[in-house]
Amino acid sequence: MAPVAYRLSSRVKVLLTVLLLVLATSTQAWAQGPGVRGGVSIDPDQFYFGGHYETPPLVDRLHFRPNLEVGIGDDVVTTAINFEFVYKFPSRSPWRLYAGGGPAVNFYSFDNDNSETEGGFNFLIGAEQRSGLFFELKVGVIDSPDLKFGVGYTFR
């Protein structure tokens, strides 16, 4: 069995390749931009960090926001690829609410050299400022982390 560091390195390369392919196939995606995110999760209890890319509206106010999150703690490293869609509610204020969800692929690497790949689904709600700052709450079902509280920034 390969060392954990090698497996993580290979997985991260695959995940980044998938994310780059998603970005490369979208012609108008540059209109919205990339972003960074971080926060805490419950079950597993972890700190997480990652990145995302938000597309322009696909229809009405529905955006595609795929993201990659890496969680550390609770004797496991979690790498999640989330294929999330968000609907942004109309607002005249500097803050706007949004809600959404989407499927996830979760890679779990345990301290005892075991690993698992599980599918999941996330539901999310959040608030974003027009400048790009956002706060988000995710609820995971199936085999996604149960709850995530996050903050992030989308570069516009």
Predicted regions and their residues:
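Hydrophobic alpha-helical segments of small multi-pass membrane proteins
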Residues: 100-105, 119-127
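Cleavable N-terminal export/targeting peptides
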Residues: 1-32
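Residues that define the transmembrane beta-barrel architecture of outer-membrane proteins
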Residues: 32, 45-49, 75-81, 95, ...
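A charged, solvent-exposed segment within the mature domains of Sec-exported extracytoplasmic proteins
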Residues: 122-156
